[in-house]
Structure formats: C-alpha cells, structure tokens
Amino acid sequence: LIAEGLLAPYVDETVPPEMLEMSLARIRQLSAHEVGHTLGFEHNFAASTQNRSSVMDYPFPLVKITATGELDLSEAYDVGIGEWDKRTVLYAYQDFPDGVDRAAARQKIMDDTIGQGFKYVADTDARSISTSHPDGNLWDNGADAIQELEHLMKVREIALQRFSERNIRIGRPLPTLEEVLVPIYLLHRFQIEAVGKLIGGQYFTYRLRGDAQEGARPVPVARQQQAINALLATIDPAVLRLPQGLVDLITPRVPNNPKSRETFSGATGINFDPVAPARSAVALTLRVLLDPTRAARLERAGAPGFDAVINGMLAATWYADASTGIDAVIARQASLQVLYGLLGLAFDASADNNVRARSLSAVQELDAWLARRSPRDQAMRAHYAFARHEIDRLQDNPAALETLVPATLPPGSPIGSYSE
C-alpha cells in the first residue's frame, strides 16, 4: 500500500518493476531479521539512527526525493546485514584458536564495539511512546529524528498532491482509494513518536561497572524545544487539509465493500469525511505531547517544562489566527482535541499531580480567555460557546470524560510483538 500510495503506479494494468523490487527487498530484509532471531539475537532499535546498522531493527522504507521532485524507492530497504550484526556474530560465534583466553578475547570484542560508537536500545526502551531514549524507536529513519520528520512531511505532501486514480489498479472500486490513502496521509506516524522521545528524553546506555560506556545525559533544552515545534507543525490545518480533487475522487462505498478498520472513521455516513483524516493525525501527535509519563519528566526537569508543551499547543490551536473554509473546520476540531486532552490529563488519577494541576490551570485560563472573546463569525461564536460548555460539564463531572469517543486510528505497525 505504501508503494502504491507513493508512486501512483498504475498507468495501465501492468505492475511497475519498482514495486516488485521494493517488495522483494523487504522480504529479504525480513528473512535476515528472522535468521537473526534464530541465531539468538534480540532487536536493536537504535540501528536506524546509525545508517541502518542492523537487520534487527524494524525498518521504515527510505524514500528519497530526486532533484526533479520525484519520489525514489530504489533504496527503500538496505541490502545485506549491517555492521552491528557483524559485531554480534563476531561476539557470539567467533571460533577462537586453542590457547586463547576466550573471556578476554570476547571482552576485547565488546570493548572495541563500544569504542566504535555502536548504539543499542532494547525492546523495553523502544516500544512504548512513553519511553525516554531518543534513539529507541520502531519504524523510524535517520540520525536526526526532527530532520527526518520534516523530510517525511515533504514526501507526504508530494504524494498527496499527486494522488489520483492511478493509485489503484484498473477495475478496482474508486472508494478503495481510501485504503491506499491511509498510510500516505499518516506516513509520519512513527516518526512523530521518534521526535517525541526527544522531549523529556535522556540518552543512556546499559552500563556495567567498570566498562567504558557513557552515563545518562538529558537531551539539551533547545533540542527539546525544536522537537515540540516540529510536532506542533504537524497539526497545522494547512498541512492536514486534503486536496479537494482527492476528496472528490473518494466516492461512497460500493455494495459488499464497506468501510473497515483500514479506513478513516468519519462523521458523514457513507460519504468520505475530509476532516476524519485530520482528526486521526492530530490524535497521533497529541498522544505523544500529552503522554503523562513524558509530562512528568518535563515537570521534574524544569526546562523546557510541561508549560512549553501546553503553551505551544494552545498557540497552535485556540490562540492561532482564524482560518477559513475547510481549514477552519479542521482547526476547530484540533482545538477541541487539545481541550479534551488537557481535561483528560487533569483528571487522570494515575498522572503526576503537578502535571494534573498545570493541565487544569491551562483549561481554566483558556475558559477565561474564551469568556472575553466575541468573534463576529457565527461558527466561531458557537465553537467558543460549546468549548465553555464542555469545560463546565467535564469539570463538574470528570467521569463523563470516559464517554468521549476518541479518534479511531487505522492500524499502523505491520508486526510488533517482542518475538518478531
């Protein structure tokens, strides 16, 4: 689906060789990954930050943009095993000659590996969005998570602008364009998590007493603020808006081919809802920014602090300049998602009390701001009035937060258990 969405390949009934080669490259990579498990090797989710140094990572396809603005998948997956893999094989399976002190020899292999700067992050410090190691991520790319997110957003923009009937095979129902659209519209979903781990993040190694590995160090404050800004850029209505031509292409579903968990969950019945994708994308970003564990780490660190996240979200939504057209509808939806997210955190009994207090304070400050506003636009007046109603209702009865229907996210990770 990703290849179909990126390349819009179906000029006629033939399947372009680029798609076949990408599929074969992925199969080869996955085969090497499973052989690695057979040999006893665990995942290394930091490999993507070191030029794809291991097949034991979960690789996201590398998409390049050519000088002419074309999308290039020729190096979507790496060839062969990586340098980290060679080091692990050397350590585990080296056949030492007689008379060699094997323990000392293996220790030298380990010391050399550390000295060469290889990184390793295990499953436990990578899978959850709450984890703090910036290098521990699934389905990400690049040494610079922020730079890679910005690159993926450009790739996404190109693919969405070119999205057409050519994204599905001739003879397929046009509504099934939505299944191809989902992974392209949410192309950045895993890179969002990678950027999020810079916020309140901490670099660390699995040190042993007496080894040469570095101690823990926090992500610099300026870098954390860059990460916050990069994530907020993903909820800009102009970024979330779909081209109107694309929206018009996705007609109501044909009989016996209903919407599924692989499509967006909208509010417009059988008609494609152009706001539903935006709601899903905003939810992906907010669940990273409003993660209770991350928020607590920010509070403990002092700078940039959880206030940097709250103030940034409010500036990007409620306090942003008014939009028009469909952008305004998307902006109002995103604003309410921020409000509900803050209220949810404020009344989350498992969250840190300082985080809860700051979240509730932000909601009350927003309520006071809304009370002073009197926009001319009728839709905005209604939006503000509804927001104030929701603030009063949910503060009086926090249990009602459980009745809110969250954005339904289409499945993302193709594999994901600890053993795969």
Residue positions per predicted region:
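Catalytic Zn2+-binding segment of zinc metalloproteases
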Residues: 35-49
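Active-site proximal loops enriched in glycine and acidic residues that flank catalytic Cys/His/Asp
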Residues: 27, 43, 47, 60
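Active-site-proximal segment of zinc-dependent metalloprotease catalytic domains
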Residues: 1-38
